[in-house]
A protein has these predicted regions:
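C-terminal motif of bacterial Sec signal peptides marking the signal peptidase cleavage site
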Residues: 14-16
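N-terminal cap/lid segment of alpha/beta-hydrolase-fold proteins
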Residues: 28-63, 488-494, 567
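Cap/lid segment of the alpha/beta-hydrolase catalytic domain
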Residues: 65-149, 198-199, 356-367, 513, ...
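Accessory cap/linker subdomain of secreted extracellular hydrolases
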Residues: 86-89, 98, 120-123, 130-133, ...
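Alpha/beta-hydrolase fold nucleophile elbow
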Residues: 152-164
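C-terminal, loop-rich substrate-recognition/catalytic regions characterized by aromatic stacking residues
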Residues: 232-236, 243-264, 358-642
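Short beta-strand/loop motif that positions the catalytic acidic residue
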Residues: 312-314
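Conserved alpha/beta-hydrolase "acid-adjacent" motif
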Residues: 319-326
Length: 642
């Protein structure tokens, strides 16, 4: 089996043989802290259907008092396995590790040392009638029931947290929650694979190509547990990812990467079906059909028990999971008004708040020092301590919304999110590349979308797992291309604070029958802006085009994600794109810019620009260069804080 890449969505903790130390507050914490202060026990907990889930329990050696349980359920392994092998760090953060918690990690059903069959984002079952009717909610319930009744020195209170996929399981835990579950923190949580991670508004994220096998490779012996990685990630023969995917052509040509000739998995007999069942799902379900809808979790957050407090955490520049946490927070808030439900929205990439790195940057952009450390000590620890160790009332001392203004670079607190005082304001994509509050005469702005020369999503030439830094990348390189339309304000005479979602209301046409539409919101910095010392050598902050938010819509889904339809050639058509929330001030002396384009490669796959029923089955001959038009009565609806 090929070398396994140890990154896996921020989920596997690297274990080092070399003893190091980490500064926490005024103390030094060594990598042997966990082994010195905790006992470790591994158990296989039986679920209601008899399947056992492998669970690792770290309990404080000081048994003179009771402790709450904090748990994480993961598909990425609760390693290291074995009684004498300890993680170097446990719990959500080092403060909680030191403060005294019973910390539990569990391999979810069908993964690693747990029995059973794994389903990628297992669908919720609202009608459990027999002990064979299970889902992730019932597995969490059964696990908590066992823990509170069998783990010594627990105080009867349980919390759950997780980042990315473990965040999905944290959200799942609040559906049909166990009475002992008092606090849950879904962080960068997956909610629906059609809008996060592998798709954005129906466009397939080609940048996730190498991650597919992580979820779609069957275990060698079916449902039999295994303690080593059984999957490999596709090796690309070049460092130039852009050129590689351009040369590969249609998506159907990538099937060969999911035929695991060296793996101990049975070959599937059906022609055109690979060994990777997730790749097969992606290919066979190009639309938001019943399969994808059933796996979504947002629709099941309408009846969250008020006994569970939730703190949703999202990174403002999370390239992987931004839709998930924001929609999780908003839907719990909408349907469970009496619940304790808070949002933390900070200047991080995927899971950046869990790392302690002093200087807080995303890509080349610097936001300040100690931001993640502040979150861990004064927000996250405070939340769990209050609901698991304190009286658990709603007076936690934390605000409803703890949000970071990524323009002013400071924290703000609000009683609601979006905050009171937000008004909707349209800005128009006006002639002569202007962005104005008042509409002007309607004109047509055309550009050629050359299928052989798609717009890159980044200047970097590299092969990456899932790109992150592009979320704050300098967009000058794109602004200077002929197939990227640019609309820009004059220099701001006063601050403009954007707080909430953004709606791009485009009016477009195409000579073809299919097209993607990408909108980017950009903060253009002044010419005298000083450079941050950690920037890439070829970049300067002078005139830096900071991408504040961006989004794509696969045009076939402009009216329905379940029922796609072609464009009528040369017919003016409305295309509305929802961009995720921002909290960013375009400061005085800066400019606000909007870029519109139709390719974003290889972040997303290429649209053939001629309509086919399934792009995963498109032929080379389907791909055509087209001319696209944006009409200047198009507008961008901003949420402006006054």
């Amino acid at each position: 089996m090929k070398q396994f890449f140890t990154f896996i969505l921020l989920a596997i903790v690297l274990i080092s043989c070399r003893k190091t130390t980490q500064k926490v507050a005024n103390a030094e914490v060594s990598d042997t802290y966990v082994e010195d202060n905790y006992t470790k026990k591994e158990v296989d907990i039986a679920m209601r259907d008899g399947v056992t889930l492998h669970t690792t329990i770290y309990s404080p050696k000081d048994t003179s008092k009771e402790y709450p349980i904090i748990m994480q359920r993961t598909p990425y392994s609760s390693q290291p396995y074995g009684a004498g092998n300890f993680k170097s760090k446990i719990a959500p953060n080092i403060h909680m590790m030191q403060d005294g918690y019973i910390v539990v990690y569990q391999d979810v059903r069908g993964r690693w040392l747990s029995e059973g069959h794994y389903e990628n984002m297992r669908a919720y079952n609202p009608n459990k009638k027999t002990e064979q009717d299970i889902d992730e909610s019932s597995d969490t319930y059964d696990t908590i029931e066992w823990l509170v009744n069998n783990v010594e020195n627990n105080n009867g209170n349980v919390g759950i947290w997780g980042i990315s996929y473990p965040g999905f399981y944290s959200t799942y835990a609040v559906v049909d929650a166990h009475p002992a579950l008092k606090a849950a923190s879904p962080q960068a949580s997956i909610a629906d694979f059609f809008f996060d991670d592998f798709h954005h508004n129906g466009a397939y994220l080609l940048s996730y190509f190498r991650a597919t096998s992580l979820f779609g490779t069957p275990r060698p012996d079916g449902d039999k547990p295994i303690d080593t990685a059984w999957y490999t990630l596709p090796d690309l023969p070049t460092e130039d990812q852009y050129q590689f995917f351009l040369d590969e052509g249609p998506l159907k040509n990538l099937d060969r990467f999911f035929e695991y000739e060296t793996a101990d998995t049975p070959r599937m007999a059906k022609e055109g079906v690979t060994d990777d069942y997730f790749w097969n799902e992606l290919k066979e379900h190009p639309n938001y059909d019943e399969m994808w809808q059933s796996k979504g979790l947002i629709q099941h957050l309408k009846d969250v028990k008020p006994t569970v407090a939730t703190m949703v955490v999202a990174g403002e520049f999370d390239a992987e999971d931004l839709y998930g946490p924001l929609e999780t927070y908003k839907n719990i808030e909408k349907y469970n008004a009496d619940n304790y439900n808070t949002l933390v929205f900070g200047p991080w990439d995927h899971g950046g708040w869990a790392r302690r790195k002093g200087q807080n940057t995303v890509g080349n952009y610097y936001f300040g020092d100690g931001i993640s450390e502040f979150f861990q000590e004064h927000i996250e620890t405070k939340f769990f301590d209050h609901f698991l160790k304190g009286d658990g009332d709603k007076n936690s001392g934390l605000p409803e919304a703890y949000v970071f203004d990524t323009g002013r670079k400071d924290w703000k607190t609000y009683d609601t999110w979006p905050p009171a005082g937000v008004v909707k304001k349209d800005m128009y994509l006006s002639p002569d590349q202007e962005l104005t509050f008042e509409p002007k005469e309607v004109e047509e702005v055309k550009f050629i979308s050359d299928i052989k020369k798609p717009v890159p999503y980044s200047e970097d030439i590299k092969t990456v797992f899932t790109p992150r830094k592009y979320m704050t990348d300098d967009q000058r390189f794109a602004a200077r291309r002929g197939d990227v339309l640019v609309f820009e304000t004059d220099v701001m005479q006063e601050d403009l604070t954007l707080a909430g979602d953004i709606l791009a209301k485009l009016k477009v046409a195409t000579t073809g029958t299919a097209a993607d539409w990408i909108v980017k919101i950009i903060d253009v910095h002044p010419a005298d802006e000083p450079a941050y010392e950690g920037m890439q050598d070829h970049l300067k902050m002078s005139n830096y085009h900071l991408m504040v938010r961006s989004e794509v819509l696969r045009g076939r889904f402009r009216n329905s994600f379940a029922n796609p339809e072609p464009f009528v050639p040369n017919e003016k058509t409305d295309v509305t794109i929802k961009l995720q929330d921002v909290f960013h001030t375009i400061k005085k002396g800066h400019k606000l810019q909007v870029q519109v384009q139709s390719t974003w490669f290889p972040l997303i796959d290429l649209n053939p620009q001629t309509y086919v029923d399934n792009i995963f089955e498109a032929e080379e001959s389907d791909f055509k260069t087209q001319t696209h038009t944006v009409f200047t009565d198009s507008s961008i609806e901003f949420s402006v804080l006054e």
